[in-house]
Amino acid sequence: VHLEFDKLQVLQSAFITAQTGRVTGVLGRNGCGKSCLFKCIMGGIKPQNIFIRFNDETETDYGHIGKRIRYLPQNVFIPADMTLGEAFRLYGVDYDGLVAFDNKFHTYQRLRSSQLSGGEVRIAEMYMVLNSEAEFCILDEPFSNVAPKHVEMMQNLINEHKATKGIIISDHMYESVMGITDDLFLLRDGYTFPIKSREDLIHHGYILR
């Protein structure tokens, strides 16, 4: 992906891969372009150049891409005036599964997303994305506003679903990301760098030690 705004280089030959059975992590500082990268993939931002391939076949139709990849953006995507039950029906995901995942949601089905905490909405949205029929999922800041107990539950859910999906995840809780990723990239200065160890993150200046 190559993306620039008014000659400001945001992404320069940024490159990531994902495959079924593996979790790919993308780390980077605030403003480095992680969300821009994901939006380019999903068609939310039109870059100067992008190349998307599924199993060696190039894909340019964003309608098809949207069916094959489901995206959890940084911001809430369930409308504030929509109930959780309605959102799950529209997304084609069984609400009872969410209740089985976390029983506190058994009384939330008729509540609007605006009536829930940020962490509760995040859990519900991530559950929807992971349980969709898409082949791949992109999770942008899934652990935002989520309590540590539920972060662990969400990590387990990601590991469960990677058996049938390719999952890309980015979050500032880098240790939580590193704990579940099979492949890891760092986005810096518009480029992606493969990360093999914690020492690589230190080398690139992402962490101090």
Describe these PLM feature segments.
Residues 11-13:
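Conserved structural motif at the start of ABC-family nucleotide-binding domains
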Residues 46, 57-70, 205:
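ABC ATPase NBD coupling module
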